[in-house]
């Protein structure tokens, strides 16, 4: 595990312990049951791809450990509406505070502003966080294989399925991919960013995509900035993309989203 993930993991475990003391699991589960119906995340992506179009998971992200502040003018509901109007299929919303300046309210407020399914983008180590995610209104959660053991991954996935949520399983190399395909989720994200060095290359997806068993919905993550990047990754079977930073830096997020998804002339 990389230094950054070790650092994040350490404070996350402290956060989880503090959250459990402040709000017992039974209380969080009660909130989760009252959160309303789940919007189908994976089904929305599949339906979009089945039309022959690209499916975009558009990310609402204020900052990151590697880039610092990404967007000062940060209004999650307005950004969610812009993404929806621009053609996004789903949203990904950062809820991690220390590293990404995210917050649970960002997810709840953004989801309330649109009809799109929403992923809680955070570092998941405990099934308590899954109930938390549903209580926030999340429709899907992320499992980063570099951050968890196989047993943790299975427990978190089963907890998500128990809440009828979808799971995006993220990998960066062959070893993580081999572990990920043992899980049940059809959503498999290939992160082009190396979490050890933070270097980013689309060649990661090009290398790993051919190794993925059929039936999985591949998601290209990180390093995607232009329509040419989508075209490049589509050549190895990727038609669903998670894009955040490049869109967050634009003045007109709706127009930038539409331009990214525009079919080649």
Swiss-Prot record:
It catalyses: 1-(2-carboxyphenylamino)-1-deoxy-D-ribulose 5-phosphate + H(+) = (1S,2R)-1-C-(indol-3-yl)glycerol 3-phosphate + CO2 + H2O. It comes from Parvibaculum lavamentivorans (strain DS-1 / DSM 13023 / NCIMB 13966). Pathway: Amino-acid biosynthesis; L-tryptophan biosynthesis; L-tryptophan from chorismate: step 4/5. The keyword Amino-acid biosynthesis applies. GO terms for molecular function: indole-3-glycerol-phosphate synthase activity; phosphoribosylanthranilate isomerase activity. It is an enzyme of class 4 (lyase). This is Indole-3-glycerol phosphate synthase. The gene is trpC. Its EC number is 4.1.1.48. Keywords: Amino-acid biosynthesis, Aromatic amino acid biosynthesis, Decarboxylase, Lyase, Tryptophan biosynthesis. GO terms for biological process: L-tryptophan biosynthetic process. Belongs to the TrpC family.
């Amino acid at each position: 595990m990389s230094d950054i993930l070790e650092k994040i993991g350490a404070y996350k475990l402290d956060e989880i312990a503090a959250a459990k003391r402040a709000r017992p699991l039974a209380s969080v589960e009660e909130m989760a049951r009252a959160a309303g119906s789940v919007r189908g995340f994976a089904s929305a992506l599949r339906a979009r791809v089945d039309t022959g179009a690209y499916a975009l998971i558009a990310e609402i992200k204020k900052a990151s450990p590697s880039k610092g502040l990404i967007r000062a003018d940060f209004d999650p509901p307005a950004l969610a509406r812009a993404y929806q109007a621009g053609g996004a299929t789903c949203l990904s919303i950062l809820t991690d505070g220390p590293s990404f300046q995210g917050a649970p309210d960002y997810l709840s407020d953004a989801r309330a502003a649109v009809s799109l399914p929403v992923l809680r983008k955070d570092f998941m180590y405990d099934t308590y966080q899954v109930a938390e995610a549903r209580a926030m209104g999340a429709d899907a959660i992320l499992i980063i294989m570099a951050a968890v053991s196989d047993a943790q991954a299975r427990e978190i996935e089963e907890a998500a399925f128990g809440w009828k949520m979808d799971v995006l399983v993220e990998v960066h190399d062959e070893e993580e991919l081999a572990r990920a395909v043992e899980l049940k989720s059809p959503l498999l994200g290939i992160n082009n960013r190396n979490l050890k060095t933070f270097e980013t290359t689309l060649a990661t997806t090009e290398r790993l995509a051919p190794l993925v068993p059929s039936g999985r919905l591949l998601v290209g993550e990180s390093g995607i900035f232009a329509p040419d990047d989508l075209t490049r990754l589509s050549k190895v079977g990727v038609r669903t993309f998670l894009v955040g930073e490049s869109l967050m830096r634009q003045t007109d997020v709706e127009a930038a989203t539409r331009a990214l998804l525009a079919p080649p002339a």
